[in-house]
Regions:
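Glycine-centered coil/turn sites that cap beta-strands in beta-rich domains
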Residues: 341-381, 389-404, 425
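Juxtacatalytic substrate-recognition/specificity segment
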Residues: 1-102, 109, 119-123
Length: 438
């Protein structure tokens, strides 16, 4: 427990002053060893309020007296004690920040914390198979599902500010604490806004990363460092839609708030895919198609309501992702329609995320060609003035990256705003609108 104490205090910077507040003159935290119920690793109990606003609680921990049961056999007894100490002491910190915070946020971040200090143990993998089989459950579901929701905070940790952002979530929770309202999503959103993101954006990105499930740099920012070690390859796909030449319609009558559906696509001919909302606001749902290119570590992500996919480019797998991203209602229904699409000689990945934030000072788009051709790229500002141009030579079956350093033809940095990309190939012209933010 001393290792855990110093890790959270010194390495991660959490406020540990609650020790002296709850044990005046003692400055020690109470930990007991007890004969706990089967399958309980430990229990953290709250005591009295320790601040004037009555939102911060003292606590103590009961550890079990042995880890011999079947639930603890994946790792050694010493490893069980280590990850349990991390998990439960993080609960003690959480109670001292906001005694009223929701259990899902407490448990998901406590599981996340285990891997921060004891990265080599990986006992938290145990929660992943069930969680990935149940993506249609809300991320804040407070059954055992909430333990697997650590994956959201793992994504935030790896891509949106590291452990400092998780700490900031708890600092916001402490500031927002009250006994009446759910402040978990407000606190998460405030912390993510401080790093140029939001809860909705992070949730959408995590849903994509969960399907790609790779650590390969080509998939960035939809990666996990330990993806290849995870005991899952992706979420459960609730339906498989096979398209050859007949129109297909698939409806889903219930999608809960903060949950997602994954739908497998099996295409043997060019397909036009449309997603329409039957119940709920259009902007409340995020839609994307993710597909992996055959025989290479490359993925394409297209967001929106209407897509054209030509499988002749070579697709290993393709999945529709539909994620609810609003707190304004609690259920949605939608319909997916697949009909004959068009063959494509030039494929330009839709920019995602859009708006694009200039934190990397480089804009990247990918182009795929099914023939040998020259590509001319022109970028225009909102006034219609050309500010940049570039040429690419693409070979049949080749994918190339177009990298733009966000400078105009004169070498000056561009300002935030809306820009239009005109892409002219041998026989096709495409226009993409991109919002770029400082």
């Amino acid at each position: 427990f001393e290792d855990v104490y110093y890790f959270f205090k010194d390495s991660m910077g959490y406020d540990i002053t609650f020790l002296s507040s709850q044990n005046v003159g003692n400055n020690r935290y109470d930990i007991f060893i007890d004969n706990l119920p089967t399958n309980y690793f430990a229990i953290t109990y709250t005591t009295s309020f320790i601040n004037q606003a009555s939102t911060s609680c003292g606590s103590y921990i009961k550890m079990r007296n042995n880890y011999n049961g079947a639930a603890f056999q994946n790792i050694t007894e010493q490893e069980n004690i280590k990850i349990t100490a991390a998990h439960e002491f993080f609960h003690a910190i959480q109670f001292s920040y906001n005694c009223y915070e929701r259990f899902w946020l407490m448990e998901a971040t406590a599981v996340w914390s285990e891997d921060e200090i004891y990265n080599e143990i990986n006992d938290h993998y145990r929660y992943m198979p069930s969680w990935f089989q149940n993506s249609a459950k809300p991320i804040d579901d407070e059954s055992s599902h909430m333990y697997g929701s650590f994956i959201f905070f793992q994504y935030v940790d790896e891509h949106l500010g590291g452990y400092e952002t998780i700490k900031n979530i708890w600092e916001r929770s402490r500031s927002n604490a009250n006994s009446v309202n759910d402040v978990s999503f407000t606190s998460i959103n405030e912390a993510l806004e401080s790093v140029g993101s939001s809860f909705s954006s992070a949730l959408n990105n995590m849903r994509i990363a969960n399907r790609i499930m790779s650590s390969h740099p080509n998939a960035d920012p939809f990666t996990y460092l330990e993806a290849e070690s995870y005991p899952v390859t992706g979420p459960l796909e609730i339906a498989q839609l096979y398209f050859e030449d007949q129109i297909i319609e698939y409806s889903q009558n219930y999608l809960a708030v903060n949950s997602a559906n994954y739908i497998k696509l099996d295409l043997v001919a060019p397909a036009k895919i449309s997603i329409s909302i039957l119940d709920g606001y259009v902007d409340d749902l995020f839609h994307a198609i993710v597909f992996k290119h055959k025989d290479r570590d490359a993925w394409t992500i297209r967001s929106g309501n209407n897509f054209n996919i030509d499988p002749s480019i070579g697709i290993d797998w393709a999945t529709i992702i539909i994620n609810s991203q609003s707190q304004n209602q609690d259920r949605w229904s939608y319909k997916t329609k697949i009909e004959s699409g068009i063959s494509e000689e030039l494929i330009v990945n839709n920019t995602y995320p859009n708006p694009f934030i200039k934190n990397e000072n480089e804009f990247i788009s990918r182009f795929i060609s099914t023939i040998d051709q020259n590509i001319n790229i022109s970028i225009y500002n909102i006034l219609g003035k050309q500010i940049f141009k570039h040429k690419l030579v693409l070979l049949s079956g080749e994918e190339q990256e177009f990298k733009w350093n966000l400078k105009n033809n004169r070498g000056n940095k561009i300002s935030s705003g809306i820009y239009f990309f005109e892409i002219n190939g041998q026989n096709e012209r495409k226009v993409k609108k991109v919002t770029i933010l400082n």
